[in-house]
Amino acid sequence: KEELTGLYKSRLIKIPFLRGMIILLDALLLGTRLLVLSANQQTGEEEKIEGPALYGTVGVSLVIGIGIFFVLPTLIAGGLEKIIETNSFVINFIEGIIRLIFLMVYVWAIGKMPEIHRFFAYHGAEHKTINAYEAQVELSPENISPFPLEHPRCGTGFLLIVVVISIVVFALLGPLDLIWRILSRILLIPVIVILAYEYMRWTANHLSNPIVRMLVFPNLWLQKMTPREPSPDMLEVSSMALK
């Protein structure tokens, strides 16, 4: 059990847009540490990965993710631009669709891995437990089990929001040379991530609105590919973790 970092207790966490970057960076580091801890427990290793090794793991993961989901679609769209005679808006839109396809294929592919299947089951337990907690019911496996696997603030849905917002932002940039196009994709990632966080936060606070529920539907639909039905012991773990 760890105390929240000082940033969570500062005024910075209340500033719109800035809070998104703080929370997401902290969640990335915490998530990496927990995945490493889980892997060590399964293999029986007690060696901790922290400090430079932890930040190095996060750094390499970010570089690979940016390369696959941002740079590669831009290169493919740039190649198509030489074949298809059209305007920059259409090319940027095609690039966004390629990025969306990459995301869906990635989520589908990792879901087929046995190790990730168990991870997704714990993810489902997490969602069910949070749904139960927000419904103000007693947190027990029996009470948690009937709740849905999907949750409007899921990280998978967040990735979808990032992709959709990137389509809009990049389409507004207009025509750019390939090098500048690639640089713009990389440099604007923090802006897109912050906008995505604020959008998700806003929709989560307005779910009683039927229009907002329609906007959230694609997020929930994509989660059909990630959370899995958890076992009772997984629900027990998730309920104890939240308590």
Predicted region positions:
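Small-residue-enriched core segments of transmembrane alpha-helices in multipass membrane transport
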Residues: F89-L103, I182-Y199
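Membrane interface segments of multi-pass transport proteins and intramembrane proteases
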Residues: Q41-E47, A77-I94, L173-L183, W202-R213, ...
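Large intracellular
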Residues: K1-G59, S88-N92, I98, F102-S145
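Polar-ligand-bearing catalytic/cofactor-coordination segments
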Residues: F93-G157, T203-L207, R213-K243
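Amphipathic alpha-helical transducer elements in NTP-driven molecular machines
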Residues: K14, L18, I22-L25, F158, ...
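Juxtamembrane "helix exit" motif at the C-terminal ends of alpha-helical transmembrane segments
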Residues: R33-Q41, S61-E85, V162-S184, P190-V193, ...
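Hydrophobic alpha-helical transmembrane segments of multipass membrane transporters and ion channels
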Residues: G56, V60-L72, I98, F102, ...
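A transmembrane-helix-recognition feature enriched in membrane-embedded lipid enzymes
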Residues: P16-S38, W202, H206-M225
